[in-house]
Design a protein with these regions (language model features):
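N-terminal intrinsically disordered, cationic/polar leader segments
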Residues: 1-49, 53, 64-94
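Acidic, glycine-enriched active-site microenvironments
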Residues: 58
Length: 94
């Protein structure tokens, strides 16, 4: 495998974490329940933070393609998180 190639194991791992975030954001069907859930912003944020930590801890040890994959998914997930959070209807309880 060249220094610029994308490891199928690494990319599958990253994409499985991305799918988990998508489930927590309510964007895709929960495979266990068979339906879309209401957004769980706490769980989604935790998974995004885990991906960010993975990026930080693997810095300098990934191929160029792996680095690009991680940067791109984090960028997209963070934007999506903000979008979902903006549309989150909060109930104000006095």
């Amino acid at each position: 495998m060249s220094s610029n190639s994308l490891s199928p194991v690494f990319s599958s791992f990253i994409l499985s974490l991305v799918r988990t975030v998508a489930v927590h954001l309510g964007d895709v069907e929960d495979p266990v329940l068979g339906k879309r859930n209401e957004p769980n912003l706490v769980a989604a944020q935790q998974m995004i933070d885990i991906l960010g930590l993975l990026q930080e801890k693997t810095q300098g040890n990934l191929t160029e393609e792996e680095t690009k994959l991680l940067e791109q998914v984090l960028y997209e997930l963070r934007l999506r998180f903000i979008d979902v959070k903006k549309n989150d209807k909060k109930i104000i309880v006095p």
